[in-house]
Regions:
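Hydrophobic h-region of N-terminal signal peptides that target proteins for export
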Residues: 10-19
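OB-fold and OB-like single-stranded nucleic-acid-recognition modules
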Residues: 18-128
Length: 128
């Protein structure tokens, strides 16, 4: 392949990416909806679990953004369309959506409740 052909292939890929907004095809994710503040601090210590729903609702009411915590992937995604997620804040959900090219933001197309969150912090396991 000569340089001109290679350049045209790269240009075509860049244009195709720009046309779809740099998003990936729709994917399904399972995760917890929480506020960015609490979830990012927990993730920094290795915890990718649901957070206290009451606390998350208070933080979002105070201006924090809603995020999707992905426990299996050990990742947190920012949510582009916040209103879709607001009613299920603190819950475990299944989300169908597209992520940006960097895989850091998701646009939710559909959301399904899997399990309601409980207002409890991470507790140590009881010893027998």
């Amino acid at each position: 392949m000569n340089r001109n052909s290679l350049f045209l292939v790269v240009l075509a890929c860049a244009l195709a990416s720009a046309q779809n907004g740099g998003t990936t095809p729709s994917q399904t994710f399972h995760g917890w909806l929480s506020d960015a503040k609490c979830s990012r601090s927990r993730a920094a210590s290795g915890l990718y679990t649901g957070t206290n729903p009451t606390c998350a609702k208070e933080c979002v009411a105070g201006g924090a953004k809603i995020v999707l915590i992905l426990p299996k992937e050990k990742k947190i995604l920012d949510i582009e369309n916040q209103d879709v997620a607001r009613a299920n804040l603190g819950n475990l959900v299944e989300v169908l959506g597209t992520t940006d090219a960097r895989g850091k933001t998701i646009h939710i197309a559909a959301l399904r409740l899997l399990e309601e969150g409980i207002a409890a912090c991470e507790r140590p396991k009881l010893s027998k």
